[in-house]
Every structure is written in structure tokens, then in C-alpha cells.
Swiss-Prot record:
This is Ethylene-responsive transcription factor 4. InterPro entries: AP2/ERF_dom, AP2/ERF_dom_sf, DNA-bd_dom_sf. Residues 90-101 have a biased composition (Low complexity). It comes from Nicotiana tabacum (Common tobacco). Interacts with UBC2. It holds the Pfam family AP2. Residues 92-196 are annotated as: Interaction with UBC2. Residues 26-83 bind DNA. It is found in: Nucleus. GO terms for biological process: defense response; ethylene-activated signaling pathway. The AP2/ERF domain binds specifically to the 5'-GCCGCC-3' motif. The affinity of this binding is higher if the seventh amino-acid of this domain is basic. Residues 1-11 have a biased composition (Polar residues). GO terms for molecular function: DNA binding; DNA-binding transcription factor activity. Residues 1-25, 67-112 are annotated as: Disordered.
Amino acid sequence: MAVKNKVSNGNLKGGNVKTDGVKEVHYRGVRKRPWGRYAAEIRDPGKKSRVWLGTFDTAEEAAKAYDTAAREFRGPKAKTNFPSPTENQSPSHSSTVESSSGENGVHAPPHAPLELDLTRRLGSVAADGGDNCRRSGEVGYPIFHQQPTVAVLPNGQPVLLFDSLWRAGVVNRPQPYHVTPMGFNGVNAGVGPTVSDSSSAVEENQYDGKRGIDLDLNLAPPMEF
């Protein structure tokens, strides 16, 4: 924006400027006529000649006419008296447009809420047997929401009964096995499971129970026991 302050009705005396009048603004490509009107003209860069734009009542009107012609000749990089209408738009204008579009019903899709309850998330994986986990690529650990049944042997050792877990699909059922009698010291002590070759390996804590001792209370105790 080329604006110069020009002193009207100024008198030069001894190299000093005597300001009798009022300062007025001088615009690029605008000249003031002696009768008070303002003429606007611009140089055509192609023809290397001046182009007459007209005479206007105010300097601002003449300056705007020059700016319009300058943008036509030199494009957006032309030197003008006033900024272009696009440059006048402040950054808040775009934000105002976005906010108004949001009020009209155009909203961005909301983000899915973040799951913070890991117990519930992993529990759902245990309930479906890990199928969803394998499909989605997630890694989960089985959470036993249903407490397994606990039994206690005569020696006080607890035993977990996995039947309740098999029903929920958390633990895979083992293959059927055969039961054969087992002899101990010539006495049929009971039956014991014999896992077949096709069955899955299940580690079981086997307990022999109390070992029977053949003693005669009428006789003296042995020397070594």
C-alpha cells in the first residue's frame, strides 16, 4: 500500500515548509485535478503505455479503481493501495465458518470411548473361548468370573474341579481315558486313571493315600521300622 502524506497549500520559505493547510493522503496511481477531482491511471506492462482509468470524486474511489486494474495486469502480486478482500479475512473467519457448520448439523464422527476396565475386556475374551481375540489380533488372558468347585482330600490337599470351567469353554475338555484297577501290596487299593495316547497331556497330582502297615499288636515291634 503506497500512501504518502502530502501537505496542501504549503509554502516554501528558506527551505522550510509552512503548513497552512491540512495533510491529505496520496495513493498510488491517483492524481488530484486543480478543480478538486481525482484522476486514476495505470501503466500497461504489455504495451508500455499509460491507461486512463477515469476521474472520481474521492481519492479512495480512484485508488480502488487503480487496485482493480493492477490485479488484472499483474495478478495477485501487484502492488496496490488496499489489501485484497481475501487478505482482509482474519483467521477467526474460518473458525466461525466451522462453528456455524457444526451448528447446522455437520459434526465430526465421535471417537469410540477408551476401554479402561481391563478385567471386563479380558473377561469377554475368556467367555467366548478366545475366538474374538484371534479374529481381532488382540492378546487376552482368561479371567475366571465363575469360581471353580474346590474339594478337599483326607490329607487336607485342595483339588480344583474343572467341570465348571469346561462348561464356560475356558479349559478344553481332555480326551476320554480308561480306568483300570491298581493293586498295592497284594490288596486291591482302588482304581486309577490310565490316560490313552490320544488324550491330551493333563498333569495330575496323584496321591497314594495312607499306606497300610501289617502289624500284630500281640507281637513286639520290629527292630527297624
